[in-house]
Amino acid sequence: MDGGGSSSWTHVSKNLIERRAVKGCLLPTPSDVMDAAVMALKDVTENIVGQQLFSVDRTNALSVIHTNEVPESIIATAIARDTSRDYLREYEGAAKCNLAATDLSHDEMWEVVIKRYWRYLRESSGAEVVDRGAVGQATQSVLSVLLLQSTFGKKRLSKNPFKHKGPNVGYKSNLEDLRSAFTKIEKYMYYMRPNDPMTKSEDTELRLHELLAYVTTCYRWLLWFMDLTDAKVLRNIDKGPVITHGPRESRPPDELVRRHLKSGPAISAGTGVALTLSTATADALIVLLRMSVSWTSHSWKSNTHGVTGAIVAAVELVTLIHHHLQYIINTVFAGYVCWLDGGVENSYLNSALRSQGRFDHFVGKLVPIMATLSWANMEKGTVMWFKYALAKSIVCHGSPTQHYLTVLESIASKRTGACPPQGSTFGRNPSGFPGQFCCPPQGPLPAPPNSKTRGTFRRCRPGSLRSSRQLPTSPPSNIVSPRTNPAIEGSTAAKNVQGAETIQVRSSGEFNDCIWYINGAYPHQRSDSSSSDNSTCSSTETQYITLPSTPSPTGDVVYTNPLLGPDEEVDASPQPVDPMSDYSAPKNPDYMRPRSTLVEEVWQLRDSDYTPYMRPSRPSRAGRSRVRVEDQTLEPSSPAGCNPPANSPENDSDDAAVDSPPISPEVVYGTFRPRAKCVYDQYGLTALAALSASRAKARRTRPGPTQPDVCRERDEESAEPRHDGFIRRTMSTTGPPRKHPDQTERVSSL
């Protein structure tokens, strides 16, 4: 028995440790973590996207296709089964919440639209149009009405834009056909996505080309329609345009539609892979052609209500089409750009963006543009689906594919304003894509085997990340940038293959930007219209608004500065960053933080219409000691290094000081507020100390006794005016105006 037991134990003990280690150790492997992450993303995504994307029939049909293509039969089946607009469920719910939060009645919405149009017409044509009060600026309610009412409103604001009943009935039928065509196109785009975002898909690229060409054609039609509407309005109110310029769109609608129907990307390819899509876009363009005939041939009512009713109906039509086109562009930026050859540098995408930018340049005062980040906060399903699909693709491929890296590099080149240098490309290692969990190594890096060089680890000195920030040298030309100076959203850092940080940008949260529920607007100064077809659409010509996915409890409007390279353009889920996240506080309390070596940094992060805080309302440069208004020779020279950059908003004082008329000192002193601090980067502590000491010395050595305020006021009342009409005063940074010597002697004699 003992021998048998001993023999049995010997046999069992041979692989006991191996079996226990393999079956008993539960330490997760990287593959386990990736699988769990993919499944978690799938569970979240299934609840907020259209059910047809995860249907059994679609999954089985795509499983037997060994290419990254989706046949049109699968797309058509998903479109037919989605009878309740399931693809738009999340977005439509958020839009209706925004409309409900406006608390505006039907008549108040009417007033919002008509007042907005009168202001737009006055600024675009120069006609003397009476504006009945302010438009309410760019508040949340106004922007919600202008963007969402025509698409998700319960009923139309203006039902009878024409004079006779027949044209009104035909117009209602055309609107229903147009909405049906828009829904079919949006469904097609929603369900045409392949399963792998990191693999090229030629069929999907062709369909995207067809959609983007369709967007370009529609935006050109909108410019033609606004030319027609503005001309008829001015004619009906017996006004003529003061600003004379050519038509904003020179081609007639029939030529625009014919050009797309005969030579569009889907028709020109001749493959038939986008036959259903080309039919849907053709249906929408034909309806627009019928509407062109209606608005051209049918007359309006001659009374005031008839003209305003036609205006409101026209604005409703424009916002309906514009919202549909924005849906297509924002969906491309939310993920579909990965299937475009060249990424954001694709020619069809650039053409569509230019058309949208041109429309915004001329009509942006009337119709705003929604940023992709705001759109993604409302349409969460598309962004979440692409995160899930990318995670699953990385697990399958093991690393990002070259095709996907090319798309990422095209986006990075737009963000930095120039192409990345040679060698600074995204690596195929997932660690090359930094996120919120990335952190520097906490110890020396081990040297590879048989290596003669030791692994080194160098900790960043305090402030080194801040000083190494590289700002864009020029603002991106993409229309998705709402400012002249590019504002930066998201906390991202593009790294090269050596791991060196090449760009460190701030989160939009540092500009008081609410990442998830932004309920603000981005107003800006808009330049005059131009009739040139080659006019560039700079970043100062786009008005971005941001809508919350749920109504704001306070109703406050947050004016902020959104991102912009392709703003549109950043990951839709950045996290707010601590303003001091790029600076590590030193242990030594006497340590003085080094100043940034980038002189242009402060000015590049400011908006084009930025008004400096507490800027003096006189033509002297901020930071200089105050002098007499009449005696310009007493203006002291600015300390070395205190001058702002040439392109700064405060560098216009010298020119103003030459030609500006004399300013009354009473007015100057009443409106002047001392500057809290000098914001120039090169204005160091030494210069501040010297300036403060000189001012203190001037106060100590000031001649003459100090009189009480009562005597001073009594003397001013009894003083006779001089030949120049007022008593000369000297501006001081520390006290009230000093008196003229003659005035001081008179007060002393009293």
Swiss-Prot record:
Region (Disordered): 437-484, 525-593, 610-669, 692-750
Entry membrane topology: Peripheral membrane protein
Subcellular location: Virion tegument; Host cell membrane
GO biological process: regulation of DNA-templated transcription
Chief location bin: virion
Positions with biased composition (Basic and acidic residues): 710-727, 739-750
Cysteines paired by S-S bonds: none
Signal peptide residue numbers: none
Regions of compositional bias (Low complexity) in chain numbering: 528-540
Annotated keywords: Activator, Host cell membrane, Host membrane, Membrane, Transcription, Transcription regulation, Virion, Virion tegument
Domain of life the protein comes from: Viruses
GO cellular component assignments: host cell plasma membrane; membrane; viral tegument
Composition bias type Polar residues, residue spans: 465-484, 541-553
Coiled coil: none
UniProt cross-references to Pfam families, sorted A to Z: Herpes_UL46 (PF03387)
Transmembrane segments: none
Protein family per UniProt: Belongs to the herpesviridae HHV-1 VP11/12 protein family.
UniProt function note: Modulates alpha trans-inducing factor-dependent activation of alpha genes.
Protein name, entry field: Tegument protein UL46 homolog
